[in-house]
């Protein structure tokens, strides 16, 4: 068996963010090869996410957020978001509550329209396709390129409109889907957004 050094353990933890026990096991099972251990941990993480996805998230909380453009003025925007987990114990943790606050603030800033892509009505997607196709023809794009251009535009619309596909406003390298997966791995439960509402507040 290969010697496992403290430097190897530290490097793998920095690369993956995995716990100490998982990192040690990954290195032992892969003869100290950091790259193989990294792949092993990645596959284990995918398996854990898939396992959690099959479970029911029946607990959680509803977080509210009021946005003010000026601390001295009344709020102009409100958000309600339902964040679900499997147990009441996790719902009461500070990490879960902070995640709900982060999501509410993200929704206020990013203005998503749907939680998941399958919630987008087909007629909405078709309307977007027609708009992009008409624009491409008006710009004189080659006929053979229009389909690819339109699909790229539609995919962009989905990514900007769907909460789970949006980049997190606090870290553009992480999507909201990845943020929830990371939280689920950390808390050991399935974490999901049930629904949300974003609304403007009119002053009398």
UniProtKB/Swiss-Prot annotation:
Keywords on record: Cytoplasm, Elongation factor, Protein biosynthesis
Spans annotated as Involved in Mg(2+) ion dislocation from EF-Tu: 87-90
Bilayer-crossing regions: none
Pfam family, one: EF_TS
InterPro entries: EF-Ts_dimer_sf (IPR036402), Transl_elong_EFTs/EF1B (IPR001816), Transl_elong_EFTs/EF1B_dimer (IPR014039), Transl_elong_Ts_CS (IPR018101), UBA-like_sf (IPR009060)
Location(s), subcellular: Cytoplasm
GO molecular function: translation elongation factor activity
Cellular component, GO annotation: cytoplasm
Family to which the UniProt record says this protein belongs: Belongs to the EF-Ts family.
The protein's role, per its UniProt record: Associates with the EF-Tu.GDP complex and induces the exchange of GDP to GTP. It remains bound to the aminoacyl-tRNA.EF-Tu.GTP complex up to the GTP hydrolysis stage on the ribosome.
PANTHER family, per the entry: ELONGATION FACTOR TS (PTHR11741), ELONGATION FACTOR TS, MITOCHONDRIAL (PTHR11741:SF0)
Name recorded for this polypeptide: Elongation factor Ts
